[in-house]
């Protein structure tokens, strides 16, 4: 199973999924032309990863902005992560004073049965 490394663009986030480290990172802006097309390989990767995950899986989400269609796809990512055996923790980063992004993380946390850690940072 190959790691996923996608360089971010002004419309798509940087993605680093590293199986051996149990590290999944999504950061930047998520406003792709077709969210389903962008996120499907990530969701498929997590499905394969869940069959033999690392003991601990750290998911780092550092999004400065995402649109509505990305929101649904991000939820699908989290739903796939629920099936991962072992410890999974989501670190949800948000910029100070960005109440909308904090609330988005809290909304996902309320829906998904995975512990979230809300981390305020100066800048994403």
Regions found by a protein language model. Give the residues of each.
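Structural alpha-beta junctions
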Residues: 54, 84-88, 111-118
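Short, aliphatic-rich beta-strand segments
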Residues: 22-28
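N-terminal amphipathic/basic leader segments beginning at the initiator methionine
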Residues: 1-15
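A generic structural motif
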Residues: 93, 116-124
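Amphipathic alpha-helical interaction surfaces in cytosolic regulatory modules
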Residues: 42, 58-108
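A short, well-ordered alpha-helical element
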Residues: 12-15, 31-56
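Extracellular beta-strand solenoid repeats
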Residues: 16, 25, 60-62
């Amino acid at each position: 199973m190959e790691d996923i490394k996608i360089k971010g663009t002004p419309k798509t986030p940087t993605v680093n999924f590293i199986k051996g480290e149990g590290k999944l990172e999504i950061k930047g802006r998520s406003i792709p032309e077709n969210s389903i097309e962008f996120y499907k390989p990530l969701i498929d990767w997590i499905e394969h990863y869940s069959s033999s995950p690392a003991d601990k899986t750290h998911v780092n989400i550092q999004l400065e902005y995402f649109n509505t269609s990305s929101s649904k796809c991000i939820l699908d990512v989290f739903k796939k992560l629920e099936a991962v055996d072992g410890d999974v923790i989501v670190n949800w980063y948000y910029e100070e004073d960005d109440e909308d992004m904090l609330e988005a993380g809290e909304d996902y946390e309320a829906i998904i049965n995975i512990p979230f850690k809300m981390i305020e940072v100066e800048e994403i």
